[in-house]
């Protein structure tokens, strides 16, 4: 029998990146349109990447098994 490989969730693979230290980085959404009503602070913070909290990082790692 052939060995069964885990499938990578392609949606998650496009949205998350694993850093050299093993943290999971993601980019915030919601700043591509309808920006006139948003404050400058909110738009500026949306440009920055952020890290997935540790309590859900394990679930994200299951979605991207070959990037970890």
UniProtKB/Swiss-Prot annotation:
Q: Which UniProt keywords apply?
A: Ribonucleoprotein, Ribosomal protein
Q: Name one GO cellular component term.
A: cytosolic large ribosomal subunit
Question: What's a Gene Ontology MF term here?
Answer: structural constituent of ribosome
Matches recorded under Gene3D superfamilies? 4.10.410.60
Protein's GO biological process: translation
Q: Which family does it belong to?
A: Belongs to the bacterial ribosomal protein bL35 family.
Q: Which PANTHER family match?
A: 54S RIBOSOMAL PROTEIN BL35M, LARGE RIBOSOMAL SUBUNIT PROTEIN BL35M
The name on file for this protein is Large ribosomal subunit protein bL35
Question: Which source organism?
Answer: Persephonella marina (strain DSM 14350 / EX-H1)
């Amino acid at each position: 029998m052939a060995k069964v490989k885990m499938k990578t969730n392609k949606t998650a693979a496009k949205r998350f990146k694993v850093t050299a230290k093993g943290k999971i980085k993601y980019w915030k959404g919601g700043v591509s349109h309808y920006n006139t009503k948003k404050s400058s602070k909110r738009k500026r913070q949306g440009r920055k990447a952020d890290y997935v909290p540790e309590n859900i990082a394990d679930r994200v790692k299951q979605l991207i098994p070959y990037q970890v």
